[in-house]
Regions:
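Acidic, glycine/proline-rich low-complexity segments that act as flexible tails and inter-domain linkers
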Residues: 1-45, 97-115
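Amphipathic alpha-helical segments within well-ordered protein domains
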Residues: 32-33, 50, 67-71, 85
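Immediate flanking context of iron-sulfur cluster ligation sites
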Residues: 39-57, 78-84
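Histidine-centered active-site/metal-ligand motif
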Residues: 55, 66, 98
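Iron-sulfur (Fe-S) cluster-binding segments and ferredoxin-like electron-carrier domains
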Residues: 25-26, 64-79
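C-terminal structural segments of small proteins and small subunits
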Residues: 81-106
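Short cysteine clusters
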Residues: 59-62
């Protein structure tokens, strides 16, 4: 078979990352724990947000990891899929909204052509 596009996130790779920057790695781990700790938002909501953002940032490791964590936090398949659809709309909506910039730019220039 062919090589995967994204290599596996193995224990050895994680250990090497910690070895190369232990203080930063420890700080990031603590940041992660604090962000995903119960607070104003429950775990399920935080993980659904993470699933949606992972799709927008297109991180395959995050998609897999946060989908599992969302499910463990009580999110059902339909809720997870709905979060993904919200992310898809927001990404598409961003392109749609930014067309305003292109239209303003075009309106401010003299054009010799159309299209």
């Amino acid at each position: 078979m062919s090589d995967p596009v994204y290599p596996a996130a193995t224990h050895d790779i994680g250990a090497r990352r910690r070895e190369l920057a232990p203080d930063i790695h420890q700080a990031f781990d603590e940041f992660n724990r604090q962000v995903f700790a119960d607070g104003a938002l429950p775990q399920k909501t935080k993980q659904l947000i993470a699933v949606a953002v992972a799709h927008v940032t297109q991180c395959p490791y995050c998609i897999a990891g946060h989908t599992k964590l969302a499910h463990r936090a009580g999110a059902g398949d339909a809720e997870i899929m709905e979060a993904i659809w919200v992310a898809a709309e927001m990404r598409a909506g961003g392109a749609f909204a930014h067309s305003t910039i292109a239209l303003h730019t075009l309106a401010g220039h003299d054009h010799d052509h159309t299209g």
